[in-house]
UniProtKB/Swiss-Prot annotation:
Keyword DNA damage: no
Biological processes annotated in GO: response to tellurium ion
Keyword terms: Plasmid, Tellurium resistance
Species annotation: Escherichia coli
Name this protein carries in UniProt: Protein KlaB
Function: Belongs to the kla operon, which is associated with cryptic tellurite resistance, and IncW plasmid fertility inhibition.
Amino acid sequence: MNALKTTHDAKAPIVAFDMTPATLRELGLQESDVPEVHAVAQRIEVGSPQTVAEFGRDVAEHTSRYADSLLDQVRNSDLDEAGEKLTQVVAKARSLNVGPLSDNRSRLPLIGPLIDRFRVRSTGFMARFDTTREQIEHLVSEVQTTQQGIAQRNASLDEMFAAVREEHRLLGVHIAAGKVRLAELREQAEGLRGNVGNDPGRVQELADLDAMVANLDKRIGDLIALQHSAMQSLPTIRMIQANNQMLVDKFHTIREITVPAWKRQFMLALSLNEQKNAVELATAIDDTTNDLMKRNAALLHRTSVETAKENQRLVIDVDTLKQVQTTLIKTVEDVIRIQQEGVQKRKDAEKQIAAMRGDLQAKLTRQPVRELAQQESV
């Protein structure tokens, strides 16, 4: 009891929530919303904490409805797919390099293969260009479909923008209603606090009312945060729409200006390269003719000189005869030396054999050791 009185003495005077035009503007409301504010405030019933817990739930349901509806229409990968396809268009365009049409040709001795090589290379490149052009047109068609989806998405984002604005307004209504009801409950709690006495029922009623006031104050704070989040969503939606529109415009530029201009430039480059190749072909033909004449003259000189040298040459060269004679003399000398060495080796072998034979006979004619011992004992 004393504690309750002390708390009452410490509290500041209660100020009723005044819905002035300035206050309403801060909450995103107008004077026409005041009746709705009072109607929403009456939903909070004294002695029913559940009404505080459910306060503002209809706003969440409103948000969930339009968010789910948009999510059913939106695929997060749409923008990624559009960007990926545009990247593929650029990659395909860059893959067509007109450089191969003007590569340096090898100098061939015959004119026919040179012309054939030029024709095959040009034909192959044109076939490659046709294939790449078909791929680019297919990718452009796919991106155009995605672009139409993005344009429709912007219309859905307009609906989302309107829904978020309505959410912001509804949150403002609930915040104002909550503050109105909060001031009333606080005033009611202060009145009860002064007459609580020693009645346990009144004490509990006051405690429940204080708890309800605290919960409602917390709920109002949450709604204020949600309203600010909704307000932040509005410029976010507009930025997304602006990005979508820039992507749509960029694709229009690529499809209607860039790709046709690229095709025209490619055809111009192809024509210029054909002219360049024609000049290079004529130059290559002239170079081949001059090179052929030079090589024929050099070949004539080489064969004539070699023929004259062969006609003045002896059947057998003197150097060959000298080498043959030197080899023959060396062969005779080597044979004689080998024969002499063989005679000497045989003589040495006979001497060694005779010595071994004498040694063997001497060993065989010697008396045994036992007989020598008997002779010594006698």
